[in-house]
């Protein structure tokens, strides 16, 4: 169990029994950003999109076993990793959950021999928070919509 500012939570590798709760959490997070909630195809098929390709997907669970955050990481053959779908339940942001998820994904990439991790930030107006979050964690802009970090 990890201690957030207001609650305890744990981070585990994805299990299919959490699929519906994960999807609901992501839709809520997108809605809170003012986006029309839609689900990305990879979230419907975590195993084939991440784990079967050598990557990994994690979820953060609260004390009631509800999904409150997620992140995925795919490993590329060129020594790079790509981070995907870092979301935290909108009313639980700024409690260290996103940072903990990011740290786990970076550790996974590093342990698997990757030297660089990259992130596509999405559109500037909708995903404005990510443009502050990643640089705070050592990521550098490589163009207007992408950041990367040497591991």
Residue ranges and their predicted role:
Residues 1-6:
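Short, Lys/Arg-enriched N-terminal segments with co-localized hydrophobic residues
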Residues 9, 13-84, 89, 102, ...:
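Acetyl-CoA-dependent GNAT
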Residues 84-85, 90, 107, 111-114, ...:
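A structural preference for long, well-packed, hydrophobic secondary-structure segments
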Residues 88, 94-107, 132, 136:
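Conserved acetyl-CoA-binding loop-helix of GNAT-fold acetyltransferases
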Residues 93, 118-130, 148-151:
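Conserved beta-strand-loop-alpha-helix junction that forms the acyl-donor binding cleft
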Residues 102, 109-123:
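Conserved GNAT acetyl-CoA-binding A-motif
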Residues 112, 136-137:
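Alpha-helix C-caps/helix-loop-beta hinges
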């Amino acid at each position: 169990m990890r201690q957030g500012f207001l609650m305890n939570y744990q981070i585990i590798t994805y299990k299919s029994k959490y699929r519906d709760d994960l999807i609901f959490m992501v839709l809520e997070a997108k809605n809170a950003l003012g986006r029309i909630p839609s689900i990305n195809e990879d979230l419907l098929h975590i195993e084939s999109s991440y784990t079967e390709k050598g990557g990994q997907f994690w979820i953060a669970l609260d004390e009631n076993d509800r999904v409150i955050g997620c992140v995925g990481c795919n490993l590329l053959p060129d020594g790079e990793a790509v981070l995907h779908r870092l979301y935290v339940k909108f009313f639980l942001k700024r409690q260290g959950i996103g940072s903990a998820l990011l740290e786990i994904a970076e550790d996974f990439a590093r342990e698997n021999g990757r030297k660089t991790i990259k992130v596509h930030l999405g559109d500037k107006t909708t995903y404005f928070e990510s443009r502050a979050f990643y640089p705070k964690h050592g990521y550098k802009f490589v163009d207007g919509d992408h950041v990367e970090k040497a591991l």
